[in-house]
Amino acid sequence: MRGVATDIGTIHFIGIGGIGMSGIAEVMHNLGYRVQGSDIADSYVVEGLRKRGIKVAIGHAPENVDGVAVVVTSTAVKRGNPEVEAALAQRIPIVRRAEMLAELMRLKSTVAIAGTHGKTTTTSLVAALLDAGGIDPTVINGGIINNYGSNARLGASDWMVVEADESDGSFLRLDGTIAVVTNIDPEHLDHYGSFDAIKDAFVEFIENVPFYGAAMLCLDHPEVQAIIPRIRDRRIITYGFSAQADVRGTNVTPGPDGNRFDVVVRDRDGNSRTIEGIHLPMSGRHNVQNALAAVAVALHMGVPDEKIVSGFNGFAGVKRRFTKVGEIVTDEGVVTVIDDYAHHPVEIRAVLSAAREGAGAGRVVAVVQPHRFTRLRDHMDDFQQAFNDADMVLALPVYAAGESPIEGVSSDALVRGLRDRGHRQANVVADADALAASLAASIKAGDLGAGDMIICLGAGDITKMAAGLASAVEGAA
């Protein structure tokens, strides 16, 4: 960090396997700092860090912080954690993840990408276009960028692209030179208390942009559009499908290999031009919207049109964003298994719409693992209306993520609501074995076959089930 030598001692990350923590740890390691960490379990993220030379202990123990200079924690790590308590006893400084990220951002000019949904994909797309334009940014993302094989990378330029997490309000520490807001929906109400407070936080995030920076705002989203009049003395560039957008997507044509579209760009003098023939190798209209945010950033930073087109062509996607993880071979043909991080009703609706687009005449089976009892409680009505594009819904038990159960809030309640709203095939499955057995029975009955898609949805451990689902179903047949 600027003005701080890299020999300050060892920096210890508690929960280093978390997707946000790991990115900061990796970049700091690449900058030359001594970095280590701990996590409660092995994971692909932990293995990736070890391959890069970062020591990771499994399990939290007081001795893990012996001799370290500073401890970094996320909001998920609370008092009572043995490493936190040991650090306090030894008077070792403890800093939050967002504070450390903010220190990294002081090194460079930054594109900070916020929004209730679409942050990770948009961050990845911005990085891809800046790479194509020769800018070579440092990147810290909330998901694995397939082109990098990691969620972080140290670039050679003076620019950094970061995903700004609004969940605990800490994104207000991240002062971007360029800010992007993809959308604003009622989420993380346990922290903010009200939707108005969430909107106020996004206004403050935008106002943190310096006078020489810019804010890229999605004009299609009503709540984003509604806060624009509140922004004073900051340059605003709008994007979306709206005819009023400065960067507007047109002629969107979905296909089996993603989307093709054009972009109409209008400058401040009212003149316009069109970037034609963009190919985005991702399904879903919502991903075209994310791509438009990336176009807005790239154009503002001087990336030529032809480099924008080539940047999209070379984009390899993001792990757990509509990721194909397997195929189930049936007598009729192949059923595709997709893994996706979607865990909010808006996200689920968008992913299932993309699946319906991709499946064509095929059937779409949604396997959902609700994430957190509070989220399911706060959005139960929306969840019960989010599965209209799924021919069949199989709901696993709620992934608690450390929360205590809430009476009346369960996957059974979700399924009852789906049925009450007219869904013809919605059922609860108890675990991974029951899921495999249910899908195998559907294949045997001829209800699932060639051209069909199984979409696994959730932010919990459903990703592990998705990875092994094809072999589990074939074994249960």
From Swiss-Prot:
Disulfide bridge positions per record: none
Catalytic activity annotation: UDP-N-acetyl-alpha-D-muramate + L-alanine + ATP = UDP-N-acetyl-alpha-D-muramoyl-L-alanine + ADP + phosphate + H(+)
EC annotation from Swiss-Prot or TrEMBL: 6.3.2.8
GO BP, sorted A to Z: cell division; cell wall organization; peptidoglycan biosynthetic process; regulation of cell shape
Subcellular location: Cytoplasm
Functional pathway: Cell wall biogenesis; peptidoglycan biosynthesis
Pfam family, one: Mur_ligase_C
Enzyme class: ligase
GO cellular component: cytoplasm
Keywords, in A-Z order: ATP-binding, Cell cycle, Cell division, Cell shape, Cell wall biogenesis/degradation, Cytoplasm, Ligase, Nucleotide-binding, Peptidoglycan synthesis
UniProt keyword annotation of RNA-binding present: no
Binding residues annotated for ATP, in chain numbering: G115, T116, H117, G118, K119, T120, T121
GO MF: ATP binding; UDP-N-acetylmuramate-L-alanine ligase activity
Domain of life, source organism: Bacteria
Function: Cell wall formation.
Assigned protein family: Belongs to the MurCDEF family.
The protein, known as: UDP-N-acetylmuramate--L-alanine ligase
Lineage: Bacteria, Pseudomonadati, Pseudomonadota, Alphaproteobacteria, Sphingomonadales
